[in-house]
């Protein structure tokens, strides 16, 4: 036994160190479990990496240049700063249904043709074995919905170009190159490259479903900020198909950009063609008015000052007219809060102020000069506008016929030769880490949740004396265990029939050696007791009380003492199976008055002691144990035997042990390593003491040699046997 100094304050540093060592020991104790789980997860990751379908990535590069506008906007560069190309709207345009819809129509992406493989692993296995996949070329396919749902058809390849098409409500045979129609389904197969018996699953999705599926694998990003370089990427399991899709998207985007530019030029050209006749008519009218006025005034000419003012006014009017045309174009592209539009409005305001200033100078001139100046201004301004519009018309005609847009394809689509998924090395590493994390976490969680007693100190902290620690007998455990332990349970079930008797069949076992040490401790503990009767009980079922009491009876009998073993567990006692003796006449028959002592006492020859088995299970075991015949039996046995060992039921299950314990001199409580908690043992001892039972202490049974226990408490139980040599 060990003692504990209650006045010593706990050292938190030492306790933390012990807890850490205990956790390390737990990991070492369960190293096989950790290795197995980690290996399992690693193998799963390897299998996933090998069997999963490789995903490839294709990319193309498109440049969006700064919008130059049409000829009407060609003069804006002098009043607004250069701006970077706006990539965000172009990215949205590339991902729009307008662009993707054209690609889906061009490549027939609504049609889905998939070869049928064994579920989950079939495709990966075919790829690993380098089995060439089948190919099915479809010229035309139409699959209507059935009951509002998309339907799938199964095509089975036959011999010599024949095939069988199966739907939910039909089965029909077809031939390559011939149109097949059945229940609204129309199909024309152009070519089949597959072995007979190969199956394909055919389905057809809506255009919107195809667009949504394409958007999930298609991404657009700007390579660097405000660079105008757009990188288009697409992922998929068919390298050739994703290359064709990307090229189609890029070309469709380019064509719509050119068409849009041409449409803008065409719209501007139409605007100019409407304006030219009106401007020409206004010019003719202005010239006629000027000529008429001069004839009336005898060819009045302008002085130098008036000519200078006229030139300035005409210049301002020309600029204002040019801004009018520019605004007509800009209003189609930008809102008024756009920097380009704001710059135009500011320029117009400046010119308007300049024109007002010039008009004030004109108003100070003689009336004749004012009128001539006004008419001349109208003629010069009209002539400038007309010539400008003619030039613009020619420029727009050329621009419309040679429109190239502001987009160009820099790099055509290319698929990278190596798949981007799965990342095999990363998957294996993650599988290893995940398996290690889960296994270690499970072991540590189990260690933190486990509350069973694993060392005598845990009982002694509650004031309970520990008379012996009996190690687990691996020899006996292998022969009697009914089920294997699991990680989160210490409870083990053992056979109660056809079991060996350890003290006789393997007397050199370490558990038997521990019981011999218990025999020595009991010799001194029972010297001052009122009788030589020893009761052994347990806290809960499966604590091992019968094993301890029967083995103790055998080792004491081996020291030439006369021993009587009484099985007082009238409910579940199984000593008759352990000793291979009859159970027809036992303790229950004696207590009920059916048999006398000479009929219920049997001699167990192999063990060298006498036995009273439990007998037949009575309906009232507690009441039988409370009868005087039980007390009389114990008194008689005390007089005729050197030691009487009474095996009683678990204390927390029934009260039988408290009934029997009042008549015995010494009592011991068996606690199972890892199964019983210190609270259960303490509560059992308390109930026995309240019943007036002289309880000496406890026995820690089934101790397993663990690294965690050794690190925490420094125990190394009974490693010596007769076969060991020094």
Swiss-Prot record:
Q: Where in the cell is it found?
A: Cell inner membrane
| TM segment ranges | 33-53, 425-445
Keywords (A to Z) from UniProt: ATP-binding, Cell inner membrane, Cell membrane, Kinase, Membrane, Nucleotide-binding, Phosphoprotein, Transferase, Transmembrane, Transmembrane helix, Tyrosine-protein kinase
Q: Periplasmic side of the membrane: what ranges?
A: 54-424
Q: Is-annotated flag, keyword Chloroplast?
A: no
Kindly give the InterPro entries that the UniProt entry links to this protein. AAA_dom, Bact_polysacc_biosynth/exp, GNVR, LPS_length_determ_N_term, P-loop_NTPase, Wzc-like_C
Instruction: Name a GO molecular-function annotation.
Output: protein tyrosine kinase activity
Q: Got a GO cellular component term for this one?
A: membrane
**What SUPFAM superfamilies would the database entry show?**
P-loop containing nucleoside triphosphate hydrolases
Catalytic activities = L-tyrosyl-[protein] + ATP = O-phospho-L-tyrosyl-[protein] + ADP + H(+)
Which Pfam family is an annotated match for this chain, by its short name?
Wzz
**EC number, UniProt record:** 2.7.10.-
Give the membrane topology.
Multi-pass membrane protein
Q: How is it modified after translation?
A: Autophosphorylated. Dephosphorylated by etp.
- The answer to whether UniProt assigns keyword Nucleotidyltransferase to this entry is no
Q: Could you say which enzyme class this protein belongs to?
A: transferase
Task: Identify the residue ranges that face the Cytoplasmic compartment according to the record.
Answer: 1-32, 446-726
Q: Which family does it belong to?
A: Belongs to the etk/wzc family.
Q: Which PANTHER family match?
A: TYROSINE-PROTEIN KINASE (PTHR32309), TYROSINE-PROTEIN KINASE ETK-RELATED (PTHR32309:SF32)
- The protein's name is Tyrosine-protein kinase etk
Organism, as annotated: Escherichia coli (strain K12)
The organism's lineage is: Bacteria, Pseudomonadati, Pseudomonadota, Gammaproteobacteria, Enterobacterales
Report which gene this protein is encoded by: etk
């Amino acid at each position: 036994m060990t003692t504990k100094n209650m006045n010593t304050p706990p050292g938190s540093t030492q306790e933390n160190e012990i807890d850490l060592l205990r956790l390390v020991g737990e990991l070492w104790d369960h190293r096989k479990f950790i290795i197995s789980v980690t290996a399992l997860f690693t193998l799963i990751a390897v299998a996933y990496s090998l069997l999963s379908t490789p995903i490839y990535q294709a990319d193309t590069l498109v440049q969006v240049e700064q919008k130059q506008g049409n000829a009407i906007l060609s003069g804006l560069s002098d009043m607004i700063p250069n701006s970077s190309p706006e990539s965000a709207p172009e990215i949205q345009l590339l991902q729009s249904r307008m662009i993707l819809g054209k690609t889906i129509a061009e490549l027939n992406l609504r049609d889905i043709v998939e070869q049928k493989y064994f579920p989950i692993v079939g495709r990966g296995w075919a790829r690993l074995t380098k089995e060439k996949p089948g190919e099915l070329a479809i010229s035309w396919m139409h699959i209507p919905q059935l009951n509002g749902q998309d339907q799938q058809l199964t095509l089975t390849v036959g011999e010599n170009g024949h095939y069988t098409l199966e739907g939910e409500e039909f089965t029909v045979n077809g031939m390559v190159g011939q149109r097949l129609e059945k229940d609204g389904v129309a199909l024309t197969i152009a070519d089949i490259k597959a072995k007979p018996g190969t199956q394909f699953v055919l389905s057809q999705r809506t255009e919107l479903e195809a667009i949504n599926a394409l958007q999930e694998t298609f991404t657009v990003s700007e390579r660097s900020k405000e660079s105008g370089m757009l990188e288009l990427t697409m992922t998929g399991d068919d390298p050739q198909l994703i290359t064709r899709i990307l090229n189609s998207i890029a070309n469709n985007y380019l064509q719509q950009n050119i068409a849009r530019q041409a449409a803008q030029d065409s719209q501007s050209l139409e605007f100019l063609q409407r304006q030219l006749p009106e401007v020409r008519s206004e010019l003719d009218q202005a010239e006629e008015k000027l000529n008429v006025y001069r004839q009336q005034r005898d060819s009045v000419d302008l002085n130098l000052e008036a000519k200078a003012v006229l030139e300035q006014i005409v210049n301002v009017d020309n600029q204002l007219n040019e801004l009018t045309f520019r605004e007509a174009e800009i209003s189609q592209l930008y809102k008024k809060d756009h920097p380009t539009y704001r710059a135009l409005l500011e320029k117009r305001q400046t010119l308007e102020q300049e024109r007002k200033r010039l008009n004030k100078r004109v108003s100070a001139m003689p009336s004749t000069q004012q009128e001539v100046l006004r008419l001349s201004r109208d003629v010069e301004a009209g002539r400038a506008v007309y010539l400008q519009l003619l030039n613009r018309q020619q420029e727009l005609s050329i621009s419309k016929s040679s429109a190239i847009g502001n987009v160009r394809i820099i790099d055509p689509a290319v698929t990278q030769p190596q798949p981007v998924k799965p990342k095999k090395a990363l998957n294996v590493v993650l599988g290893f880490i995940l398996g290690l994390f889960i296994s270690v976490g499970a072991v540590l969680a189990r260690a933190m949740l486990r509350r069973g007693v694993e060392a005598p100190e845990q009982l002694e902290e509650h004031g309970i004396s520990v008379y012996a620690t009996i190690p687990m007998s691996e020899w006996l455990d292998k022969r009697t265990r009914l089920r294997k332990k699991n990680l989160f349970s210490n409870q083990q079930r053992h056979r109660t029939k056809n079991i060996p008797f350890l003290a006789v069949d393997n007397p050199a076992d370490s558990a038997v050696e521990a019981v011999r040490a218990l025999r020595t401790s009991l010799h001194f503990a029972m010297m001052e007791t009122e009788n030589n009767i020893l009761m052994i009980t347990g806290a809960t079922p499966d604590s091992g009380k019968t094993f301890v009491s029967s083995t103790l009876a055998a080792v004491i009998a081996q020291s030439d003492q006369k021993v009587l073993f009484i099985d007082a567990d009238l409910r579940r006692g199984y000593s008759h199976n352990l000793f291979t003796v009859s159970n027809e006449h036992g303790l229950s028959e004696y207590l009920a008055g059916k048999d006398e002592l000479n009929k219920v006492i049997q001699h167990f020859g192999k063990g060298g002691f006498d036995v009273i088995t439990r007998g037949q299970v009575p309906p009232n075991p507690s009441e039988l144990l409370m009868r005087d015949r039980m007390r009389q039996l114990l008194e008689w046995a005390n007089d005729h035997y050197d030691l009487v060992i009474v095996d009683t039921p678990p204390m927390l299950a029934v009260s039988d042990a408290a009934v029997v314990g009042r008549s015995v001199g010494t009592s011991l409580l068996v606690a199972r390593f890892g199964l019983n908690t210190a609270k259960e043992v303490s509560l059992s001892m308390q109930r026995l003491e309240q019943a007036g039972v002289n309880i000496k202490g406890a026995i820690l049974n089934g101790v397993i040699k663990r690294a965690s226990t050794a690190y925490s408490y420094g125990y190394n139980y009974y490693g010596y046997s007769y076969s060991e040599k020094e």
